[in-house]
Amino acid sequence: MDQRTLLAATLALVAAGQAGAQTPDAPTPAATPLDAVTTTATRTRAVAGDLATPTTVVAREEIERRDARSVLDLVRDIPGVESSGVPRTTAMQPVIRGLGDERIVLRLDGSRNNFNAGHRGRTFVDPELLRQVEVLRGPASTLYGSGALGGAISLRTINAEDILQPGASFGGVASMGWQSQGSGPRGSLALGARAGDFSVLGAMAGFSNNNFTDGRGTTIPYSEDEATSLLGKLGWNPGHHRFELSAMRFRDNNTLPIAASTATTTSITDRETVQETLSLRWSYDDPSMPLLAPQIVVYRNHVDIQERRLTGTRAVDGTTLTTTGIDAQNTSRFGLGAFGRHALTYGFEYYRDEQEGTSNNLSRSQFPTAQQSVLGLFAQDEITLGAFTLTPGLRLDRFEQESPNGLNDRSVDRVSPRVSLGWQVLPWMQPYVSYAEGFRAPSLTELYVGGQHFPGNFFVPNPNLRPEVSRNKEAGVNLRFADVLRDGDRLRVRLSAFRNDIDDFIEQTVLATTTVSRNIGQARITGVEAEAQYDAGTWWAGLGASALKGDNLETDQPLASIPAHRVTLNAGYRFLDQGVTVGGRLTATAEQDRAPRTPGVAQQTSGYGVLDLFASWTPTAAPNVRLAVAVDNVFDHAYRRSTWNSDPVPAFYETGRNIRGSLRIAF
């Protein structure tokens, strides 16, 4: 869909909504992110701040306030979470506790997003269509299988119920915005309706921008972008059942280097990225039947990237991955007297990946045509024994990988255990300890890749790669207080320390004439994290801090993906009578002087501080309208994120000052 068409449609609906809007409830103080409910950490509903698994929830209110252009803009303030890659929006990727790419499981409405193909990104969804983002930090293979060494990110899209006013049968939300960086407009429109047990949702969102500039006033080449997302849902709620059919399509067009996530300006291509996700979900929840709470999702996720090279061979390269799968679980709740209360969650997951790489419609060995089938069986029991909560879990995965070019097929089996123990010492204090193992089977590309990497250098397949296995030890404490400074206020604090030992770490080694992936032996990542949120209704404050260290124990060199020590402070004030909110965020990042000693790439990164300011107004005479302004990087500081330290010299700097404004109307 053309960007001008999207914005025109948004403006038209904004005008209509202003004329016929219904008045929502008056603003109320928000719960802190640690009070939010998550279903990712344990596959059951739980309060994020009460868990022995560090989990942070970004809810719809925060998503709307940020007016973010990417999922990474929503999560980069979470302790231990960073983004890798230069500031080209769709090419950037998340990093959790120093691990990124296929070492993080990414799920969209319960369907796996397994796509990861060298420098091409993987978070293909507009934040305007999201109702919640959940980030689980630390190994999660017991529940989510291969890839969850660093953690898991769960994205949940909006439903009709999220945009309809109480008692309304039809309604919607329209928004439009603009930012100075890249002179970029954006817009979104969501319409919902319900009749009896049925509901329907249709939504679209998109943005476009020219090239960004960094804090020095220098253009960031090939950072222009244009993307559109479409979402449709049908819901049916007969009795205690919930059926939901969902379809999403993301399309992105830009001109950029093949290695778009690095600071390169060569090998330019016209790239079109399309992701289509179709899912059918069923769940049943009857409080009178505690042994039965099943959830099943069947899905198909297809990613297709077409690249027309503008230099060199001028070939047309195709990169596709189709994941088809089913995820089924049930939770049984029961008591066993002196043996405590139990919430036993068990189920299975099956999915099949089929990938294909082409160049001018011929096979392209840099992204080899190959398939894999995965079956996982899992069980986890949350056992409450007085003040103690013991949660053991276990998962068995079997991989069957089918190779091209006559290479041997493979099968891999892996058992992933996890156990945690929490102790409610006092009503406001819960220390915990946990042990979790994660694993990542080698990707099809790592196993079977071939062809030219760059002129004079060629990929060498390695079908003998072993799975990566991580063993994470963690200790922490959850604190929660009420009525601290005034009646009704809330304070949540989480402190944690961990050590993650990774065996058979897979690293891509670039030699004089060849590039090969190999198991390097051992890596170790240690860290401490702190997260705190306070909310008093009229004002709030928050803190997020992390300090990580990562080493390749075989070479005694630092890992390149470890972010620098960082502290983020945010605070704001709500003038509830006037509907005005003002606030700011300060990010202070230390120097990163621990980087691999690799000639020809950026090494250390300097420390920096970045201040962002924001304000919004919901007029008392028009409570369905929200106007917002923000200034990112107020002092136009020039800086580089520490996870870019493997980029070629000279490396790019982050975007400079950015002034944003938006208008949102509910009707």
What are these regions (language model features)?
Residues 30-165, 475:
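Acidic, small-polar-rich N-terminal luminal/periplasmic segments of exported/outer-membrane proteins
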Residues 176, 202, 293-309, 432-434, ...:
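Membrane-embedded beta-barrel scaffold of Gram-negative outer-membrane proteins
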Residues 212-217, 221-227, 240-291, 301-323, ...:
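Flexible loop and strand-edge segments within Gram-negative outer membrane beta-barrel domains
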Residues 251-264, 400-402, 423, 427-474, ...:
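Surface-exposed extracellular loop regions of Gram-negative outer-membrane beta-barrel proteins
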Residues 431, 439, 537, 576, ...:
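C-terminal beta-signal and adjacent terminal beta-strands/loops
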